[in-house]
């Protein structure tokens, strides 16, 4: 399915989302990211009658959609995997973690040992952890953990870009908002890029 079949328009009603959103959900102080209006979560109409309560990532538009009843979805602006590292397909949420620890994958260590070797033993959860405040772990039936995540970041400059090792990322306050909506076993679709 292509983006044009999913979204009926780009004009949408903004959802109240501020830098203070996460403070109600976390005892840790998060920065105010001061994102422009177009980077805030919005409720948008979707064209097709997709099942509610699914996650869909469209990499060409850097959009992550949490589908809801009534052919609407909550849209978040995300950063996605770099060319060659974005993996389209169907997944499910196999784990959810608050302030998760992080260890670089074997692939990350092979590709960029100078960047990741110092963290080969892992990093405790916290504001400077690459997975941010929350993470949704993507699993496949029969395979288990894919090492792909939908996770937080404290670097808003990475949103709307192809920057990651395959994961989708949101700023921490928006990730907390999404995390609180998405239950275990939720179906996740990473749609293929158009090129």
Task: Please annotate each region the language model reported.
Residues 4-24:
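N-terminal export signals
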Residues 32-148:
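Gly/Pro-biased beta-strand-loop elements
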Residues 24-30:
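Cleaved targeting-peptide boundary
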Residues 168-195:
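N-terminal targeting pre-sequences for secretion and organelle import
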């Amino acid at each position: 399915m292509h983006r044009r079949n999913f979204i009926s328009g780009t004009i949408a009603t903004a959802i109240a989302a501020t830098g203070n959103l996460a403070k109600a959900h976390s005892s840790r102080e998060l920065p105010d990211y001061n994102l422009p209006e177009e980077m805030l979560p919005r409720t948008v109409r979707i064209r097709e009658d997709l099942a509610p309560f699914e996650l869909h990532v469209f990499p060409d538009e850097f959009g992550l959609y949490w589908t809801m009843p009534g052919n609407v979805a909550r849209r978040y602006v995300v950063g996605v995997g770099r060319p060659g590292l974005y993996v389209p397909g169907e997944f499910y949420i196999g784990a959810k973690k608050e302030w998760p620890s992080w260890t670089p994958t074997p692939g990350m260590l092979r590709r960029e040992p100078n960047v990741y070797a110092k963290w080969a033993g892992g990093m405790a959860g916290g504001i400077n952890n690459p997975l941010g405040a929350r993470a949704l772990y993507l699993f496949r039936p029969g395979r288990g953990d894919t090492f792909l995540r939908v996770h937080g970041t404290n670097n808003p400059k990475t949103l709307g870009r192809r920057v990651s090792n395959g994961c989708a990322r949101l700023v921490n306050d928006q990730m907390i908002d999404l995390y609180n909506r998405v239950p275990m076993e939720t179906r996740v679709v990473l749609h293929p890029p158009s090129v």
